[in-house]
Amino acid sequence: MADLSSRVNELHDLLNQYSYEYYVEDNPSVPDSEYDKLLHELIKIEEEHPEYKTVDSPTVRVGGEAQASFNKVNHDTPMLSLGNAFNEDDLRKFDQRIREQIGNVEYMCELKIDGLAVSLKYVDGYFVQGLTRGDGTTGEDITENLKTIHAIPLKMKEPLNVEVRGEAYMPRRSFLRLNEEKEKNDEQLFANPRNAAAGSLRQLDSKLTAKRKLSVFIYSVNDFTDFNARSQSEALDELDKLGFTTNKNRARVNNIDGVLEYIEKWTSQRESLPYDIDGIVIKVNDLDQQDEMGFTQKSPRWAIAYKFPAEEVVTKLLDIELSIGRTGVVTPTAILEPVKVAGTTVSRASLHNEDLIHDRDIRIGDSVVVKKAGDIIPEVVRSIPERRPEDAVTYHMPTHCPSCGHELVRIEGEVALRCINPKCQAQLVEGLIHFVSRQAMNIDGLGTKIIQQLYQSELIKDVADIFYLTEEDLLPLDRMGQKKVDNLLAAIQQAKDNSLENLLFGLGIRHLGVKASQVLAEKYETIDRLLTVTEAELVEIHDIGDKVAQSVVTYLENEDIRALIQKLKDKHVNMIYKGIKTSDIEGHPEFSGKTIVLTGKLHQMTRNEASKWLASQGAKVTSSVTKNTDVVIAGEDAGSKLTKAQSLGIEIWTEQQFVDKQNELNS
């Protein structure tokens, strides 16, 4: 047994060393096959001799049993956000405030990693708990998923009790590999590495997270009691010695001009990095000076985050293609010479509509400027006429639908051209794709390519046909093995139990969005009651305007639609509202019965999370500001809704005020 114990220790040392070389230093000294061989040897020993399995065993990285959900846990110390700077003037004002309070200052500049903030707790040197940032006060316990990240030490080099903060991210190489795999499986692609990292860390099955090859950079420690550090730079050096991975592209600078030089350097070099960054974090380096400056309610006074402007690149417009949406809108898309934008290769970008093409004088063959709106959606910003070739072609939208040949129309008051043929194949396929989407019937496994195959094979012609599919229908399709077929049929069966609002939204009734579907489902409770409503009744409902009322009644009066609903009923698709009625919610008086509008970008939660929480407290969340609005919650870059609220004298809360009120209720 002594020999076995020695071998286990040897395997631990070797696997930890090889893992660090591969995942942290990106410089492996042995081939993957050698690592896998040693790992399987250790797994076998632990299976046969469980007494040798330790909490810091390299086998933990493989992942464990799937969880039912993530527990909410309060942070020992709140995870605050940072104030933002968008230009040199913002930074100089920050510097002036600092120097007015503490005099001469040295700054620490660090890359702002574009990922997911996490908090890691260690007891006696062992990693015991990892949380997401959440709302800053409460996060989700994702410990098992974080254990699969090789850059996170399961055991520190010293037996300290400490909590560190960092940013979990997905390297670009892992992101490209993941999206290639998802594309092969006809699954929805991730928009960017940040979304991929967040989605990977919220997998209930940690084995799936382990396959995603995430990494992490640690950037701070909560309590410096056990640290021999007098500055942020020394604290990062100490973290390195303890076995943590910090970002080495940091720099100490003596003044704000040094900060600006650092920003200029990494603005030009950010694409050379193997991971995404979205800005620069600037901190007062001296820890005593940090203590002297303290905190506001939402952020430290001694730090700020400079956010990069949206990156713009020049490429060539090769062609313009058209797509037809489920409501018949014809949208032009730019086909581009592939170019890197904000870390990903872009070959297509939105042109929105014909008016935009003409207003911006965009022609096929032009050199055009492309950016990602919010670093996510590529769009053509403008053409460069001075570079225009002689053979550049002015684009004219067609007069007839490229899918069905029906004449296109422009409805009064709209900029888009529209195909109004109800039997247009492109619209029908897009309608099927919409029906199975996440906010509608949420049928996992029915991707675009499979739906197109099913439609072209005439196995489905309308949404009800989905519930009539059999194993014999699905098995002959491309890339559909037995396991995939079984999973898809199970997902279709599960979708039958969705609440009425999912079905209403999935039917694709024009002008009827997620919120209005929820309102109608809650109000009428069954599809049969909805089939009898009139426009006059609907317009009396708050949040249901004239357009929605007319569209819903016209749609539900159609005999073909009534036959479709009966076809769904025949397959026992649920047509009843299953949610909790707002009138039954005993919310807090601060929110109950109030009409609230969310505007601008929220940092401590998503808009959807905020809306759900407000609804749980009996509030009514609407999309427009009127004299009946009680409160407007204004996030970053709030625009016309905030201006209108100010002109109407409506109460306005910042995001932090909203979060503070949530925390008061939870305490």
Swiss-Prot record:
What are the annotated GO cellular component locations? cytosol
Q: Which residues bind Zn(2+)?
A: C401, C404, C419, C424
Reaction(s) catalysed by this chain, per the record, are: NAD(+) + (deoxyribonucleotide)n-3'-hydroxyl + 5'-phospho-(deoxyribonucleotide)m = (deoxyribonucleotide)n+m + AMP + beta-nicotinamide D-nucleotide
Q: What Pfam families would the database entry show?
A: BRCT, DNA_ligase_aden, DNA_ligase_OB, DNA_ligase_ZBD, HHH_2
Required cofactor names:
Mg(2+); Mn(2+)
What InterPro entries does this protein map onto?
A: BRCT_dom (IPR001357), BRCT_dom_sf (IPR036420), DisA/LigA_HHH (IPR041663), DNA_ligase (IPR001679), DNA_ligase_AS (IPR018239), DNA_ligase_CS (IPR033136), DNAligase_adenylation (IPR013839), DNAligase_N (IPR013840)
Keyword field: DNA damage, DNA repair, DNA replication, Ligase, Magnesium, Manganese, Metal-binding, NAD, Zinc
Q: State its Enzyme Commission number(s).
A: 6.5.1.2
Biological process according to GO: DNA repair; DNA replication
Highest taxon listed in the record's lineage:
Bacteria
Which residues are noted in the entry as NAD(+)-binding?
Answer: D32, S33, E34, Y35, D36, S81, L82, E110, R133, E167, K283, K307
Its top-level enzyme class, in one word, is ligase
Identify which residues the record assigns to the active site. K112 (n6-amp-lysine intermediate)
CDD domains referenced in this protein's UniProt entry, alphabetically: BRCT_DNA_ligase_like, LIGANc
The reply on keyword Iron is no
Domain (BRCT) ranges: 586-667
Q: Which PROSITE patterns match?
A: BRCT (PS50172), DNA_LIGASE_N1 (PS01055), DNA_LIGASE_N2 (PS01056)
GO molecular-function terms, A-Z: DNA binding; DNA ligase (NAD+) activity; metal ion binding
Relate the protein's function as given in its record: DNA ligase that catalyzes the formation of phosphodiester linkages between 5'-phosphoryl and 3'-hydroxyl groups in double-stranded DNA using NAD as a coenzyme and as the energy source for the reaction. It is essential for DNA replication and repair of damaged DNA.
The UniProt family comment states: Belongs to the NAD-dependent DNA ligase family. LigA subfamily.
Q: What's the protein called, per UniProt?
A: DNA ligase
Question: What organism is listed for this UniProt entry?
Answer: Staphylococcus aureus
Q: Which gene encodes it?
A: ligA
